[in-house]
Amino acid sequence: MAEKNYTVTGMSCAACANAVEKALNKNNDINASVNIATEKLNIEYDEKKYDFDKIRKIVESAGYGLVEDMTEDKKMELYQEKITSLKKRLILAIIFVVPLLYISMGHMLGATLPEFLNPKVYPLNFALAQFVLTLPIIYAGRDFFSHGFKNLVRKSPTMDSLIAIGATAAVLYGIYATFRIITVDPEAHMDLYYESAGTIITLILFGKLLEAKTKGQTSSAIKKLIGLQPKKAKIIENGVEKEILIEKLKVGDIVIVKPGEKIAVDGRIVEGSTSVDESMLTGESLPVNKKVGDKVVGGSINKNGSIRFEATEIGKNTVLSQIIKLVEEAQGSKAPISRMADIVAAYFVPIVIGIAIITGIAWFLSGSGLVTALSFFIAVLVIACPCALGLATPTSIMVGTGKGAENGILIKSGEALETAYKIKTVVFDKTGTITKGKPVLTDLIAYGNYDENELLKIAASVENDSEHPLAEAIVNEAKEKNIEIKPYEKFRAMPGYGIRATFEGKEVQIGNRKLMENRKINVEISQKDYDILSNEGKTPMYISIDNELAGFVAVADVIKETSKEAIEKLKKMGIKTIMLTGDNEKTAKFIAKQVGIDDVISEVLPYQKSQKVKELQEKDEFVAMVGDGINDSPALAQANVGIAIGNGTDVAIESADIVLIRNDLRDVAGAIALSKATITNIKENLFWAFFYNVLGIPFAAGIFYAFFNGPKLDPMIAAFAMSFSSVSVLGNALRLKFFKVK
């Protein structure tokens, strides 16, 4: 099964998105989801049966368009075209609706009309003038009619269908009344309803324009990220400086960046030193110092030194492109909380049409007359707003994930954003998460016939090619002391225990107490030293040669400056904290005490970490696992929410639901707080959307007028209310932009 994302065109409400989903999902081997806020189609399909053209034809059969691989520039161009088109159509409608309202209602307010339009003297002129003025307004709102009636014929009615039926009913009644003026009843000019049709279309065009503009603001985070990338870059070609388009950059090109310029792509500095502003990418406010050999990230700003760097990643492989991709995917995904709204939206429009018809018939049969029945019929149609329901969740998800990205918190899906606020227990890996992951060798104790330098040479030689941070500490110490590192043979890594290798004909083993116990090596001589160093928070590792204890080394990792504050923030939120580590119990408890962690689970092998998380979940704990994604990927995947600590460049950690780019543990609390704020915002939106429709539709149907002698809702007021219902939902979602992630 292949998974793709495409852009759907021509949608106007949640019912449209549902129609596209329905058309696609009725086919075997297709699983489709449409996000109305982003206009994105996420689809899984069998590549042997379907391709883009076949999928596009299915979407077109539902009345919509499908676009493949649309660039951001093209999206922006289409967005601006949509705004411009709506503005022109709204202006056209306003030009004609103003005189239409003046003619139809001005005389009621004492306004003077030309004699030839006097309804009492020339009722036909009065009616025909309104009819003529209504036609350009209908033209301005032509899309409502074309899309609305087409979808009605396809048995997938949308919001456009409601508008089209309501406005058409008003116009047809106006035409009927005009013929009555000609034939039998000059007094029919009293209720023409042309002004209702014209005003409904104008107000909804105005609402659509506001909605489009507001929706554009919800995706501002993506636009900011895209705006970080420069269009051109300066390279050295055959010894000559040359400016080229960024699309023409190749891996290996030497790029020149002067102070104040943006870094075009990812690379490694080969000449010069500087400080780089990465705040727009990582949320890190302070410039980061860079020198020869250091990585630079595309989209960051060179502050105060000229540098040359070799391009290592270009195009879609850059960190910036990956961040944009992750944010787009998150904004296009659906949160579980939206399912109820989606179900309601699927049946909403047909139900509203049914309610409108029943309302009209009931009022007509009650003896109130055709005009009153028509008024209630139209009011029900135009007040109903599936858009508010459809936009309630995705717009908040868009703004929430965008806000996270601006602060170095990459939330990969709407589900992760919704789930994070439920977290009650946070489990931390130690090395590289609570600590910096750059341990140093603090102690080396030799026993028997070995001296410290000889033992360090043996240990560094067999650990030289290991990627483990503890091995790196041993090798670095040997290099600092200029101790020769020699070749080894038969290297074997034993995760959770240590390593084994042959060095100069001798079997060397370096690892923890479990390794020594498994090999039945006596370590009693070292017990006192082991306890002292463990109690100081250091990690002791035994060294055996030919199955006899030769000594041990102790390695210490520095605790991150922000770890203690991060734990305090979580405790204030009522969240339990646990450290899960392969370290011995004494070392683990020492580190945990330093930062204030509640509980410790120590001496855990890498493959056991996910099982420990599962055991916590079985106790009805909602668990987040925080790690670096290196040896704790299964635990990240097992947790209800997997949170990976990045390093400013690694954002594609597959097993994580959330990636913290800044490598700052305080962002764990920030991600949870953002999730709570977003879910609260979604619930507010859903409440408003349901409350508006549940209250508005009965009000428009005349329930309060009939039974409580309440006010009667004019169709024009109903149209005004509908226009602003979706805008209010969007406006509420935009409040998240002011949320401070601390």
Identify the function of each model-found stretch.
Residues M1-N125, I137, K224, V240-E241, ...:
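Flexible metal-binding regulatory segments at protein termini and peripheral loops
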Residues A2, T38, I411, I423, ...:
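Conserved ATP-binding TGD loop and adjacent catalytic N/P-domain core of P-type ATPases
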Residues N5, N31-K49, D53, K57, ...:
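Conserved cytosolic catalytic loops of P-type ATPases
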Residues E60-M76, L128-Q130, T134-N238, K248-V255, ...:
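Actuator/coupling domain of P-type ATPases
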Residues K88, S300, K424-E467, Y497-I578, ...:
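ATP-driven catalytic headpiece of P-type ATPases
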Residues I91-P99, M340-G367, F377-C385, L391-T395, ...:
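Bilayer-spanning, highly hydrophobic alpha-helical transmembrane segments
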Residues L109-L124, V153, L172, K403, ...:
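Membrane-embedded alpha-helical bundles of multi-pass transporters
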Residues F149-R154, K213-L228, T395-G414, L734-K742:
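Juxtamembrane helix-loop transition segments at the membrane interface in multi-pass membrane proteins
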